[in-house]
Amino acid sequence: MVPSLALVPGEPAGIGPELCVRLAQRPRPDAHLIAYADPDTLHSAAKSLSLSVRLLDPDQPARAPGDLPLHPVRQAVATRFGAPDPANAAAVIAGLRGAADACLTGRLQGIVTGPVHKAVINAGGIPYTGTTELLADHAGCPVVMMLANSIVRVALVTTHLPLRAVADAITADALQQCLRITHAAMQRDFGLEDPRIAVLGLNPHAGEDGLLGREELDIVIPVIEQLRGDGMHLIGPLPADTAFLPQKLGGFDAVVAMYHDQGLPVLKYSGFEQAVNITLGLPYPRVAVDHGTALELAGRRIADPSSLMAATALCARLAARR
């Protein structure tokens, strides 16, 4: 059975709507996509691209280029590409929550999300740190953020934290939870019976035997040894500056990084256009683009849909496995 997936464009003034319109030009045999978006914004995006879009009822199949089933989410004000309005923050969140509700009730089997502008959501009076955190809270379960491309998969112990707060957030419980969720997802979603997971140290040179920090000795190594006893194939703690060398990456199925900018620069450098953001641990697959709203590109017909296409293809595969 072909899975039904929500397609949520994110910030309406960014490139998300036009990427969705571009995606609709190629009907997919692997998924039934339903956009959770404002219809006027999608029509405006199509006009800016000189493309056609035909918005269908959610249950209607997309058969021709430009067909896009729609669950309408009305905005408070009309979209001006490149100029986000906090008045539309509630509609952005409503689209995400509506899609999540449909997955939790079994009406849909996954969510593909476009980029959201955190500052605009907060300016609209809605506390928001990220879609990963919002969906985790909505589902009531712990999750892990993983970024992936064709070369490497990187899971994060901490996500959107100031650097000065990272060390305090690296606890035995947090690391163990991240590793357990990552291990389970690699087995269930990626079909790896015995996934090989590399664990990075927090400090330079993985602490250098305590000389450059004790987190490896006091937290990371004890957790790794405990989970190895449970049967997990864990490698580390590894110094982050050499863990991503090509000759080493072939020995890992995933890398667990301690913080956002430890693991993601290498991934984005190695294949930014095809990179995607996967939320591990949810009761349904959620895959997002790995780029921002790109307000400066919105409406200019130059935004690259590669990440959204990759996210949609992966979400369809993950949904089919469940």
Curated annotation (Swiss-Prot):
Pfam families: PdxA. Its EC number is 1.1.1.262. Signal peptide: none annotated. Its cofactor is Zn(2+); Mg(2+); Co(2+). It is found in: Cytoplasm. It is an enzyme of class 1 (oxidoreductase). Substrate binds at T132, K268, N277, R286. GO terms for molecular function: 4-hydroxythreonine-4-phosphate dehydrogenase activity; cobalt ion binding; magnesium ion binding; NAD binding; zinc ion binding. InterPro entries: PdxA, PdxA_fam. Keywords: Cobalt, Cytoplasm, Magnesium, Metal-binding, NAD, NADP, Oxidoreductase, Pyridoxine biosynthesis, Zinc. Binds 1 divalent metal cation per subunit. Can use ions such as Zn(2+), Mg(2+) or Co(2+). Gene3D superfamilies: Isopropylmalate Dehydrogenase. It catalyses: 4-(phosphooxy)-L-threonine + NAD(+) = 3-amino-2-oxopropyl phosphate + CO2 + NADH. GO terms for biological process: pyridoxal phosphate biosynthetic process; pyridoxine biosynthetic process. Pathway: Cofactor biosynthesis; pyridoxine 5'-phosphate biosynthesis; pyridoxine 5'-phosphate from D-erythrose 4-phosphate: step 4/5. GO terms for cellular component: cytoplasm. It comes from the Bacteria. A divalent metal cation binds at H160, H205, H260. Belongs to the PdxA family. The active site is located at the dimer interface. Homodimer. Catalyzes the NAD(P)-dependent oxidation of 4-(phosphooxy)-L-threonine (HTP) into 2-amino-3-oxo-4-(phosphooxy)butyric acid which spontaneously decarboxylates to form 3-amino-2-oxopropyl phosphate (AHAP). This is 4-hydroxythreonine-4-phosphate dehydrogenase. It comes from Xanthomonas oryzae pv. oryzae (strain PXO99A).
